Amino acid sequence: MVVNILVVNPNSSKSMTISLQETIEKTISKESCEISYFTGPNTSPPQIDGQETSVQSMKACLPVLTDDKGSIYYFQKFDGILIACFSDHPLVTELKDVAAKEKSNVSVVGLLDSSIQYCNLVGRNFSIITSNKEWIPILNASVQSKFLTGNTIDKNLWKGTVSTDLQVLALHSPDNFQQIADIIRDENLRKLDSEIVILGCAGFSGLQNKLAKKFEKEGTLFLDTIEVGLEILITMIKFVRSQK
């Protein structure tokens, strides 16, 4: 049976949604998933670059997803929802809370929680590469306070966050690829000794294979958080369905 998923871009940049869709259509079979896409309304910021814009986007998106039962984006019309922002985005928790109150079986995941849990299971050194520097303390605090397992902490597998010092919308520009690759080599690999590098922003979507090829000799695993998030979400949906 086909699963019905909503991918939520919580900012108001339609170009980011288009980029997400292009990446997803290359990796996820249409035969197994029916995927719809939501872009934040005009009251949502054009890009999310910290805690303030995260909260702003949550307040803009949540009513659209939960208040109007006739809307094509009403959350209960989907089996699962992926919040496509790499942060401890408050929309993830808020949607889960609404679903729990209404006793809905919809599964909700974000990019940060799903990718960190994947790394916890793999059990190898990992770090994050992100956009602007403001994200470093935010992501480090979120990961360390909420998402690490005891085993990951005991083995010191979590190595921290590195910034490209680029804004979200600039990450996808071909002109910046070499700069991003140089930072990964110097900081994530040499300095932090990472075996897995999480591409910690939706703006990196689609760069996984290009970076893997660039660092083929090093054997680095690059984690496309959209792909990992979707695969985990699909597994959750199938498990819920198996109980019926």
Residue map of PLM features:
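Eukaryotic N-terminal targeting leaders
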Residues: M1-V3, R241-K244
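N-terminal glycine-rich phosphate/adenylate-binding segment common to multiple enzyme folds
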Residues: Q56-A99, V109-L112, E195-Q208
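Short, acidic/small-residue loops that bind anionic groups at enzyme active sites
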Residues: L95-V122, K214-L233
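N-terminal beta-loop-helix "entrance" segment that forms/cooperates
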Residues: Y37-P63, V168-P174
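Short, hydrophobic alpha-helical segments
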Residues: V122, N188, L230-S242
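Active-site rim beta-loop-alpha module in soluble metabolic enzymes
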Residues: T130-A202
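N-terminal beta1-alpha1 ligand-phosphate binding loop
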Residues: V3-I28
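Short hydrophobic segments within beta-strands
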Residues: V8-P10, F38, I128-S131
